[in-house]
């Protein structure tokens, strides 16, 4: 019984680690747009995380695509390292709060969207 519990705990810990380590991460500039859908290589729309950096100055953006469309939370930074804006998408449509920041990184305004429409 003790061996079964140990094996179960081992599987419980290792399987999620393997699954999450397989998630793709790609530089945004490597993607190709065709008719509003993003592709990395091949014929299948890209699914996975993307990022981009300013040349020698840190992060520019992070986000995620699902089936070639923006999905989930996206964050953009200014060259000075301060947050520029935060966006949220669901299957390519604007969804949730979009937060904009000024040059000092202070929240300037919030726009709310649901299924691509301003609310």
Q: Whereabouts are the PLM-identified features?
A:
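Glycine/tyrosine- and acidic-biased, solvent-exposed loop/turn segments at the edges of beta-strands
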Residues: 18-119
């Amino acid at each position: 019984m003790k061996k079964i519990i140990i094996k179960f705990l081992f599987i419980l810990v290792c399987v999620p680690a393997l699954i999450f380590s397989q998630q793709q991460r790609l530089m945004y500039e490597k993607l190709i747009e065709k008719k509003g859908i993003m592709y990395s290589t091949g014929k299948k729309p890209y699914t996975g995380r993307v990022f981009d950096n300013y040349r020698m100055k840190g992060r520019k953006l992070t986000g995620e695509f699902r089936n070639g469309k923006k999905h989930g939370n996206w964050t953009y930074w200014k060259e000075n390292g301060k947050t520029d804006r935060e966006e949220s998408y669901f299957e390519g449509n604007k969804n949730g709060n979009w937060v904009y920041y000024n040059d000092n990184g202070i929240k300037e305004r919030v726009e709310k969207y649901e299924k691509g429409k301003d609310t």
